[in-house]
Curated annotation (Swiss-Prot):
The keyword Transit peptide applies. The keyword Transferase does not apply. Residues 185-380 form the CP-type G domain. Belongs to the TRAFAC class YlqF/YawG GTPase family. GEP3 subfamily. Residues 1-17 form a transit peptide. May be involved in the mitochondrial lipid metabolism. This is Genetic interactor of prohibitins 3, mitochondrial. GO terms for molecular function: GTP binding. Keywords: Mitochondrion, Transit peptide. It comes from Lodderomyces elongisporus (strain ATCC 11503 / CBS 2605 / JCM 1781 / NBRC 1676 / NRRL YB-4239). The gene is GEP3.
Amino acid sequence: MISRLIHSKHYLTLFRQNSSIAIPLLYSLELRCRSCGIKVQDKNKDEPGYYIKPVKLLNDSKTFSEQTQKLGLVVAADAPNILQNPIKKRPLDEAYDKLISKMSQSDKDLLINDFTLFGQPKYKDSKELETIPKNDKGETVKEVVNKIYTVKPDETSVECMRCRNIQYQSSYKMTDENFPISEMEQVLQNLPRASTAPLVYLFNANDFPMGINPNIFKFRNPKDIYFIMTKTDNLVADIKNKFNKSAILHEYTKNFVSDYLGIKYGVPKQNIFLSSSLKGWKLDELHRFIPDGSYIIGNTNCGKSTMIKSLMLNEELQNKKEQVRHVPFNTVSKIKDKFKQQFYQKVGPGVSYLPGFTRDIIPLNIGLKTVYDVPGFSSSPKIHYLYESIKEPKIIHRLIKGEKTFAKGYNGAQYKSFKGPQVLCFEGLGYLQLPKDCLFQIRNVTNFKIHAFSNIDKAAKLAQNIPPSLANDFAIGNHSLFSQFDKYLVPPFYGSIELVFENFGYIHIKPIGAKQSNELMKLYLYPGLQSIIRQPIINYITKTPTGFDKYGNALMKYDPVYKSEFALKRFRGGEEYQPLFSRLIPCVEDIEKFVGGGGGGAVAAAGAAAGAAETNIVDGNDAQGLAQSLRSQEYLQLNQFLKRRAKYDESYYMDASNKYDFWVE
């Protein structure tokens, strides 16, 4: 019957016209993991998609113990579902049950201290038990509410062992097979009806605009893509009403994102939505915003599955709201909280901070709409290496969470000052080398723990053998800074910038005092971690001091901030266009030219120069000459990479008029 249906012309017409019906039908023909979407199998536990088949689905009559012995392992959470033979009770439990069965209901409640119902005394004696309001089925109000807020089990729902081990044991192997991550082009080409299906593109507020791959516009017209910024609560505070400050900041942020996507790519403003699944912002509006039959796409860890699950939960809660309208809030509140927790665990796609958790397309119904959760993509081929190297899963979870801009990144937030040639270590995942004798204020809008070293040579030596006292300041184990890390030059800049780390947040960098040299900052990144620099995002999402008073006069540095006029910066095109961000410049290794061999590139050369000067291995003139040669080599690499007439060197003067001349998007 199914074979005839699939090959019939009627079915093919249905498939073309309504994918939201056809795709779930096709997926229902195969047993798949509800968390990651992979097709499951129970033959080989070393192959992807392995799961433990419930005993009731097996055709033989072996007992539970024999089945589990054959399978080789037992999952405690599965036991209630697959248990066939009852477990014999202990004598102590049998005696307890016998005594309990002889007690009245009031004595049972007294035993467990259950004195209250809806905040009032439940009953004083057994006669009062008969006066508790019940419906025609003999159910109390509390029992009815519990029944309403019960997650109904799906008999056909299964989970593969990879997903169960991640969820219950935090156990995983970060391999390409277990966590497949493809490039965007490959993911889009694998979508059914790839040329016409609606696309909803999610991107992360923590690292904007890194989460937007411009190649998406090779597959769709900008007017046909819907963009959703996730984790927006990290940029603006919670929204209470349209008149408070948070709502105004939310509007500023939406205008900024709309300006950027509209000017850069031609995306209409009505195709942009700002959301926070954690805070549950405007979920009803978000549901209306997403077209029926949409494919939800985006980078890994951008929050696709979390958003979908929040929409599913909101739909369930709305359906139940009318049923408990007359029940006191205190009665419903705790039961509803328990329901939410169970819903997140048992319904919808799995949610994880690990990249590549979703392994195949998962069709999901949200009200009358059907959407498809699509595996995330990445432009970094070494992303598995990055996450596999991090010591503990809880560290990944902490770093992915990000920080709040209006707690750590605004102009009045706490900062720390550092002076070059100090090196800032971001838990071993990145090292930022500051130019010599230059002073900077650093605001940390990530969850990185920052440790400062006096120079790059000392940082490299300690990284090879991390002492126990600093172990908690490193997300990875011992490593070789000179040979393992990717090296980059930070393009020249004027004024404040932000160093953005993909998925993790950003570091606000503000130069202080007179500029001592044109030496470039250098950033060393662990393989798989990507970074850019950008203009301070705070200038675009809230009004900031202009540095001029109300008469247009420039203020002095020592003038109080309140004398300044405040203005909101807008992202503009045309002659007023300024690049929002810049890529970093790859640093080519050429150590032999400077120190006569030894390997390790310009990073090692810089460390050698700093170490030699401090330990008097060479005299001051030789160390100074070596450092100058290194800077000249870096200037040459910068100019060659940009292929521009403007030549950056020691004498180049930067100001507000040319501060973006060396930025490349």
